[in-house]
Amino acid sequence: MIRTRFAPSPTGYLHIGGVRTALFNWLLAKQAGGQFILRIDDTDAGRNVDAALKPILDGFRWLGMDWDEGPDVGGPHGPYFQSERGDQYRAAAEKLLADGHAYRDFAKPEELQTLREEAQKGGEAFVYDRRWMAEDEATAAKFEAEGRQGVVRLKMPREGQCVIQDLIRGEVVVEWASEQDHVIARADGSPLYHLASVVDDHELKITHVVRAAEHLPNTARQVFIAQSLGYELPIYAHLPYVAEPGGSAKLSKRKLDKYKKNRDFAVLLAHGEKIAERCNMQVDADTFNPVLVDFYREIGFLPDALLNYLLLLGWSLDGETEKFTIAEMIEKFTLDRVNKAPASFDPAKLQSFQGDAFAELSDEKRTELVRPFAVAAGFVADGDADETLKAVLAAAGDRLKMAGDIVDFDYCFVDDYSVDEKAYEKRLAKADGAKELLAKLNETLKAATEFDAANVETTVKSFCESEGIKIGQIIHALRVATTGAASGFGMFDTLAVLGKDKVTARIEKTIAGLS
């Protein structure tokens, strides 16, 4: 049985790149009828694990990516937190020491730094000569008496090669001489990443280690640990990393200021911030950004649309097909179609996927998803009927690309809507005759007996004919006067949704402001 895993650290957020890696593991397991395991790498004792883990688990649940074993669901191979597996790591370290594949080392950091600098001056690669290695208890006691602290290092081979068969990279050959004697346990006995990861993968019976390419340099030393402990090696597959928008560097949550210079990224972030502000969301500025999954959940993205887009970051079925249901992803996904090159994160394409998916929803589902945002923004109250909301959604059509986009149509619900100052200046304040035309049109609208979209259109067009003007000479001023916006869904649909009383009152208020 195929068993894959995703092993996040409890950082308090779920990174887009991490989710893409988790998705590929999840799909591989699902397709084969295997199991997907969630393991928590929580060896940092200073971190509040429960608080930091919750957003990660919530993110996976929102995405619909269930796990067969791990936090909250348990399983036969637990515990699933590294902080609870100390005995296993200590036993593995002791076996490596006993079998001569590791040693206790008492070098001080500053001594190692001096050796590195000397090697650098001589133009040579630094290779630790093990001069502070304790080969027996007497030597260890001597070093301890000097106030030194002993760590556990791997005793790496100095000759030969490590040959790694990677499902994506092919055959990868690493010269053992290029590997350092890596530290695998601290002086207090607590494990470091390489030891813990190998032991966990073995004891959790992981068959396929599918992870980002940045871990490829770790693989030879992990192979050495596994073979030294007598473990069967898993199958390795190293994915291309997710690159930043318009660039080749790895996507990082720490480079938000840089990404804001990318137009599409900046537009997405600004829109998210607008939704958060209007809906009174309590968001963390450090984690509310498009590099992290929670951003999309907060602003009303569809999880399936996000997963569909992430699937294509490094994978392709035939170079043409882009839209997949979750069932189709599971059916079609194979590792042999994963690219080696990094895939650049494209905010505009992601939004396009979201818009297409949202447009395919039923009217009832769209209303269900949008309603919480409308309530949070104060557009409707809990328990209110949805007539106005449904009318706005019907009129907005594909202009509404995600649930949070309802904030763009605040003018349909409330009178404290935002006003586009540039549009106001251009279409009203500095437009010759706009005030007079609006005043005349308003009297015509007040006299209208029917105010549905079709009748309003007839009324406005008849007014233009009687005034000898083209509709373009009044329609833009009319939109700004009644909505404050430079653009939106159909003008006559907009007027019908607002209703005659609200339309005429807003025109009167606008005229008064132009006096």
UniProtKB/Swiss-Prot annotation:
It is found in: Cytoplasm. A motif ('HIGH' region) lies at residues 8-18. Keywords: Aminoacyl-tRNA synthetase, ATP-binding, Cytoplasm, Ligase, Nucleotide-binding, Protein biosynthesis. The keyword Ligase applies. GO terms for biological process: glutamyl-tRNA aminoacylation. ATP binds at K253. Its EC number is 6.1.1.17. GO terms for molecular function: ATP binding; glutamate-tRNA ligase activity; tRNA binding; zinc ion binding. The keyword Transmembrane does not apply. A motif ('KMSKS' region) lies at residues 250-254. It is an enzyme of class 6 (ligase). It catalyses: tRNA(Glu) + L-glutamate + ATP = L-glutamyl-tRNA(Glu) + AMP + diphosphate. GO terms for cellular component: cytosol. Transmembrane segments: none annotated. Monomer. Catalyzes the attachment of glutamate to tRNA(Glu) in a two-step reaction: glutamate is first activated by ATP to form Glu-AMP and then transferred to the acceptor end of tRNA(Glu). Belongs to the class-I aminoacyl-tRNA synthetase family. Glutamate--tRNA ligase type 1 subfamily. This is Glutamate--tRNA ligase.
